[in-house]
C-alpha cells in the first residue's frame, strides 16, 4: 500500500556541506593516489582549476551560499521531485514494482538544473561575469542559459554541429534565454568536440570566465562538485521509497553517459549492500557493430578530458568516435567515480541498444502518459529487463533524468508518425 503522506525530505545544502566517505583524495583520485580521476590538464589551466577548487571548498560551508542554493532549488527549480510508482509500466517488468524518480519535472526539464544552479552561484561569488558550458542533448545548455539569465551572467554554449541539428528545439530555447550557441564543426561534431572547444575558450578567457562542466567527469574538482550538486536526487529518493514501499529498493538504475544523473541517485545507496546499483550505457546499433557509446562494455582505461577513467580508444590510444540515438549519451568517456565503482564491483554497468531504448520510450508514453528523454529511456529499458530478472514484487527505482520534448521529432521519425495526411 502506497503511503500518501509527505515525508520530511533533505535539502540541497545537506548534500554538499559535509564531506562523504566516498570523496576522492586531495588530488581528486578515487581509490587512492594512483587511482581514477586526477587532473590531466595543460599547465595554463592549473591555476584556474585551483581557484575553482578553493572557491568551492569555501562556499560549500558558507551559510549564505547554502541558503541561496536551498531557496533557488525549492522556489525556482521545484525541488523536491516526486517519486511515482508506474503501475501499468510495471506489468511489463515481470510484475516488479517500478518507481520513477521524476527529475523530468524539474524546471528546464531534467536533472541538469541541480548542478547548474550551484555552479552559477559559485561563478557569481567568484566574481566571474561570463559562463561557458558544453552540451550534447542540450539539456545542460538550457539549464546553464537559464541560470545565467537568472543571475545576470553572459553565457556561451558549445554544442557539436550534429547535435545542434538533432536538438534544434533546445538550441532555440538557449537562444531565447539569451545565450550564444556555438556549433562545433570539428571532429565527430558531438559532445566530446564541444568539450574540447569549451576548454580552449576557458584557457583563453580564464580571468572573467567560469566553465560550468555539465557531467561528473573532467579534472578535479568537477567530478566531485557535480556529484555533490546531484546527490540530492538519491537523498530524496531514499526517503521517498521507504515511505511508499516500506523498505529500501532491491535496485536503483540510471542511464550513464558522463554519469551525473547516475552518480546523483546512486550515491545515497552506496553503503547499502542489499541495494543493487545498475547503470545502463548506450549500445547504439549494438556493441558488436562498433557504432555505440558503451564505454564500460567496450572501452579501456585512459586519460580523457582532464581525468583518468574509461574511454573508447584504439590500440594507439586515440579516441574512437561514439554513436547513440541519444545525444546526451553520445560520449566516448565516463566520470572517474563510476570507473572506481565499476572496479570495486559496487555498480554493474550494462549496454542498452537504440532499439531497446526506443521500445521503452514508446511503452512509457503509452502506459503512463510520460514522454521521457531518450537518455532516460535507456534506464527504463534496463529496468524492464532487470524487473524480469529480479521477479515479482521486486522494488526498482529508476532515475527518470529528463523529459522528451526535445526528442519528439526523433521519436516521431523512429515510429513513422510523420506521414503525410
From Swiss-Prot:
Biological pathway: Amino-acid biosynthesis; L-tryptophan biosynthesis; L-tryptophan from chorismate: step 5/5
Required cofactors, per record? pyridoxal 5'-phosphate
Q: Name one GO biological process term.
A: L-tryptophan biosynthetic process
Task: Quote the catalytic activity from the record.
Answer: (1S,2R)-1-C-(indol-3-yl)glycerol 3-phosphate + L-serine = D-glyceraldehyde 3-phosphate + L-tryptophan + H2O
Q: What domain of life is recorded for the organism?
A: Bacteria
Molecular functions (GO terms): tryptophan synthase activity
| In-chain residues carrying the UniProt-annotated modification N6-(pyridoxal phosphate)lysine | 112
Q: What is its EC number?
A: 4.2.1.20
Q: Which GO terms describe its cellular component?
A: cytoplasm
Enumerate the UniProt keywords alphabetically: Amino-acid biosynthesis, Aromatic amino acid biosynthesis, Lyase, Pyridoxal phosphate, Tryptophan biosynthesis
Assembly mode: Tetramer of two alpha and two beta chains.
Q: What does this protein do?
A: The beta subunit is responsible for the synthesis of L-tryptophan from indole and L-serine.
Family that this chain belongs to: Belongs to the TrpB family.
Q: What protein name applies here?
A: Tryptophan synthase beta chain
Q: Which organism is it from?
A: Mycobacterium tuberculosis (strain ATCC 25618 / H37Rv)
User: What is the organism lineage in this UniProt record?
Assistant: Bacteria, Bacillati, Actinomycetota, Actinomycetes, Mycobacteriales
Amino acid at each position: 500500500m502506497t503511503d500518501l503522506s509527505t515525508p520530511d525530505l533533505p535539502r540541497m545544502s545537506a548534500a554538499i556541506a559535509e564531506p562523504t566517505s566516498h570523496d576522492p583524495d586531495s588530488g581528486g583520485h578515487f581509490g587512492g593516489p594512483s587511482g581514477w580521476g586526477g587532473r590531466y590538464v595543460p599547465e595554463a589551466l592549473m591555476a584556474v582549476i585551483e581557484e575553482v577548487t578553493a572557491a568551492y571548498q569555501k562556499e560549500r560551508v558558507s551559510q549564505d551560499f547554502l541558503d541561496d542554493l536551498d531557496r533557488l532549488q525549492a522556489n525556482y527549480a521545484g525541488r523536491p521531485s516526486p517519486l511515482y510508482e508506474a503501475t501499468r509500466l510495471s506489468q511489463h517488468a515481470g510484475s516488479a514494482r517500478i518507481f520513477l524518480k521524476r527529475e523530468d519535472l524539474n524546471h528546464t526539464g531534467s536533472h541538469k538544473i541541480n548542478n547548474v544552479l550551484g555552479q552559477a552561484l559559485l561563478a557569481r561569488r567568484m566574481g566571474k561575469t561570463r559562463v561557458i558550458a558544453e552540451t550534447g542533448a542540450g539539456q545542460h545548455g538550457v539549464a546553464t542559459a537559464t541560470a545565467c539569465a537568472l543571475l545576470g551572467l553572459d553565457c556561451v554554449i558549445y554544442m557539436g554541429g550534429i547535435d545542434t541539428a538533432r536538438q534544434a528545439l533546445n538550441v532555440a530555447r538557449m537562444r531565447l534565454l539569451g545565450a550564444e550557441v556555438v556549433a562545433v564543426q570539428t571532429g565527430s561534431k558531438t559532445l566530446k568536440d564541444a568539450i574540447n572547444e569549451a576548454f580552449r575558450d576557458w584557457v583563453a578567457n580564464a580571468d572573467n570566465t567560469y566553465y560550468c562542466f555539465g557531467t561528473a567527469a573532467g579534472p578535479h574538482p568537477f567530478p566531485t562538485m557535480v556529484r555533490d550538486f546531484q546527490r540530492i536526487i538519491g537523498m530524496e529518493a531514499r526517503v521517498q521509497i521507504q515511505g511508499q514501499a516500506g523498505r529500501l529498493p532491491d535496485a536503483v538504475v540510471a542511464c550513464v553517459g558522463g554519469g551525473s544523473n547516475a552518480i546523483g541517485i546512486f550515491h545515497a545507496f552506496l553503503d547499502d549492500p542489499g541495494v543493487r546499483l545498475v547503470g545502463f550505457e548506450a549500445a547504439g546499433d549494438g556493441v558488436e557493430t562498433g557504432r555505440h557509446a558503451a564505454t564500460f562494455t567496450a572501452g579501456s582505461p585512459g586519460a580523457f578530458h582532464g581525468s583518468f577513467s574509461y574511454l573508447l580508444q584504439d590500440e594507439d590510444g586515440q579516441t574512437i568516435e561514439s554513436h547513440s540515438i541519444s545525444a546526451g549519451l553520445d560520449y566516448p568517456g565516463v566520470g572517474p567515480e563510476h570507473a572506481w565503482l565499476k572496479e570495486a564491483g559496487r555498480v554493474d554497468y550494462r549496454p542498452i541498444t537504440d532499439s531497446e531504448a526506443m521500445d521503452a520510450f514508446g511503452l512509457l508514453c503509452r502506459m503512463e502518459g510520460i514522454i521521457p528523454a531518450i537518455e532516460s529511456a535507456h534506464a527504463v529499458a534496463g529496468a524492464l529487463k532487470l524487473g524480469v530478472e529480479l521477479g515479482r514484487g521486486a522494488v526498482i527505482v529508476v532515475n527518470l533524468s529528463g523529459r522528451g520534448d526535445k526528442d519528439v521529432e526523433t521519436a516521431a521519425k523512429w515510429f513513422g508518425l510523420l506521414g503525410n495526411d
